[in-house]
Amino acid sequence: MQGFISQVLGPVVDVEFKDYLPQINEAIVVNYELEGKECKLVLEVAAHLGDNKVRTIAMDMTDGLVRGLTAVATGNPISVPVGEKVLGRIFNVTGDLIDEGEEINFDKHWSIHRDPPPFEEQSTKSEIFETGIKVVDLLAPYAKGGKVGLFGGAGVGKTVIIMELIHNVAFKHSGYSVFAGVGERTREGNDLYNEMKESNVLDKVALCYGQMNEPPGARNRIALTGLTMAEYFRDEMGLDVLMFIDNIFRFSQSGSEMSALLGRIPSAVGYQPTLASEMGKFQERITSTKKGSITSVQAVYVPADDLTDPAPATVFAHLDATTVLNRSIAEKGIYPAVDPLDSTSRMLDPQIIGEEHYKVARGVQSVLQKYKDLQDIIAILGMDELSEEDKLIVERARKIEKFLSQPFFVAEVFTGSPGKYISLEDTIAGFKGILEGKYDDLPENAFYMVGNIDEAIAKAETLKEVSRKDVCLDNCKVDKAKKG
């Protein structure tokens, strides 16, 4: 059905039809010429103004749009390609390829506006999603089909953790991942693409980008584009999918911009009045079904570090676990720099993870907390002033801190150490042994950047051998000096 543009107000475009009224969320296409180039703009219907006139939100820049241009209603919402063909490629909000690679004919397309799975299809089991990362699996385990908040400043290793998770899901669970770049920097999107290429994980992930320089419609709907691709892998292929959203705050922020542009009365702190329902509608689609699951890791930017801001506060209500990255841990050279005391999970419950796992996790946190409390005394008076019991706690805590580090597959290029995937059983056994004092005789350096506890024992032997050789060399030098 053909109509024409009657008004252009930045990213908001009014379209008038003669005998037709498009539905809310229907896609309208405008083809026009700008500086001698053919352009195609997709608009999404956001409001009915009466007299067959609709107000739409543009999914790209509206440069060059003029009143009177022909607009064609498609009769359907925005639909994007789905299936295995999307892996290794970069898409924009409308499902067009933007990686300058070879063109592909996609045979399957799904609408980005979908209902969540019905209750009878959803899985009621509480299962752990094993990541192979010790600190996560032990202290803040992810729920299969759950939602994880990833908190951390710039340069503490968010991207590396995301890439490692993509790697482990692909190689250990034979699963796929979808990455949605929601309103982040174009440079970061480019860096992530290149790093994934170098780390050989690109062919297991689909990338959807709606970056900072794009209109609010594109930044908001890109999250739905990525989620739709993930839903296909879950519902049609029965896979366990990992969905990354960087950054979920930008989803709320762009929704707020759209709301203001449409003239809706703002709510608290200027956010849209529908903030909670929009977030709920989106998050409800991320779930486990009897066929497969979508587990999402969502980077959360907290504006001005204010946790009570409505945007992050609305996200917190949906999270099952939080992974907090701490700069002070990264400064010690411990990677991944996950804070073992700040990170949380609703899965850390003896009825879900079992008594042994729960006791070991709480034991580790207890020792680390005591060590944290003792640090002021150590800084002022030194280790010698501590009681024997406290000295033992400090020694074990330092070993635990070191043992929480691990070499990543995707960081092999930088560290020179082969990556390690550590099963949950090995992780629990290793930390249980440290808490029980089985490894009190091993040096703390033996626990740094190793996989399971057997590797720590082997590393301790190597360190002992090296120090023995050093002592022999020193003795030989002394003997030669005496003879000389």
From Swiss-Prot:
<keyword id="KW-0997">Cell inner membrane</keyword>
<dbReference type="GO" id="GO:0005524">
    <property type="term" value="F:ATP binding"/>
</dbReference>
<keyword id="KW-0067">ATP-binding</keyword>
<comment type="similarity">
    <text>Belongs to the ATPase alpha/beta chains family.</text>
</comment>
<comment type="function">
    <text>Produces ATP from ADP in the presence of a proton gradient across the membrane. The catalytic sites are hosted primarily by the beta subunits.</text>
</comment>
<keyword id="KW-0813">Transport</keyword>
<dbReference type="InterPro" id="IPR036121">
    <property type="entry name" value="ATPase_F1/V1/A1_a/bsu_N_sf"/>
</dbReference>
<protein>
    <recommendedName>
        <fullName>ATP synthase subunit beta</fullName>
        <ecNumber>7.1.2.2</ecNumber>
    </recommendedName>
</protein>
<dbReference type="GO" id="GO:0046933">
    <property type="term" value="F:proton-transporting ATP synthase activity, rotational mechanism"/>
</dbReference>
<dbReference type="InterPro" id="IPR004100">
    <property type="entry name" value="ATPase_F1/V1/A1_a/bsu_N"/>
</dbReference>
<dbReference type="GO" id="GO:0045259">
    <property type="term" value="C:proton-transporting ATP synthase complex"/>
</dbReference>
<keyword id="KW-0139">CF(1)</keyword>
<keyword id="KW-0406">Ion transport</keyword>
<dbReference type="InterPro" id="IPR027417">
    <property type="entry name" value="P-loop_NTPase"/>
</dbReference>
<feature type="binding site">
    <location>
        <begin position="152"/>
        <end position="159"/>
    </location>
    <ligand>
        <name>ATP</name>
    </ligand>
</feature>
<dbReference type="InterPro" id="IPR020003">
    <property type="entry name" value="ATPase_a/bsu_AS"/>
</dbReference>
<keyword id="KW-0375">Hydrogen ion transport</keyword>
<dbReference type="Pfam" id="PF22919">
    <property type="entry name" value="ATP-synt_VA_C"/>
</dbReference>
<dbReference type="InterPro" id="IPR005722">
    <property type="entry name" value="ATP_synth_F1_bsu"/>
</dbReference>
<dbReference type="InterPro" id="IPR024034">
    <property type="entry name" value="ATPase_F1/V1_b/a_C"/>
</dbReference>
<comment type="subunit">
    <text>F-type ATPases have 2 components, CF(1) - the catalytic core - and CF(0) - the membrane proton channel. CF(1) has five subunits: alpha(3), beta(3), gamma(1), delta(1), epsilon(1). CF(0) has three main subunits: a(1), b(2) and c(9-12). The alpha and beta chains form an alternating ring which encloses part of the gamma chain. CF(1) is attached to CF(0) by a central stalk formed by the gamma and epsilon chains, while a peripheral stalk is formed by the delta and b chains.</text>
</comment>
<dbReference type="Pfam" id="PF00006">
    <property type="entry name" value="ATP-synt_ab"/>
</dbReference>
<dbReference type="GO" id="GO:0016887">
    <property type="term" value="F:ATP hydrolysis activity"/>
</dbReference>
<keyword id="KW-0547">Nucleotide-binding</keyword>
<dbReference type="InterPro" id="IPR000194">
    <property type="entry name" value="ATPase_F1/V1/A1_a/bsu_nucl-bd"/>
</dbReference>
<keyword id="KW-0472">Membrane</keyword>
<dbReference type="InterPro" id="IPR055190">
    <property type="entry name" value="ATP-synt_VA_C"/>
</dbReference>
<keyword id="KW-1278">Translocase</keyword>
<dbReference type="GO" id="GO:0005886">
    <property type="term" value="C:plasma membrane"/>
</dbReference>
<keyword id="KW-1003">Cell membrane</keyword>
<dbReference type="InterPro" id="IPR050053">
    <property type="entry name" value="ATPase_alpha/beta_chains"/>
</dbReference>
<dbReference type="InterPro" id="IPR003593">
    <property type="entry name" value="AAA+_ATPase"/>
</dbReference>
<keyword id="KW-0066">ATP synthesis</keyword>
<dbReference type="Pfam" id="PF02874">
    <property type="entry name" value="ATP-synt_ab_N"/>
</dbReference>
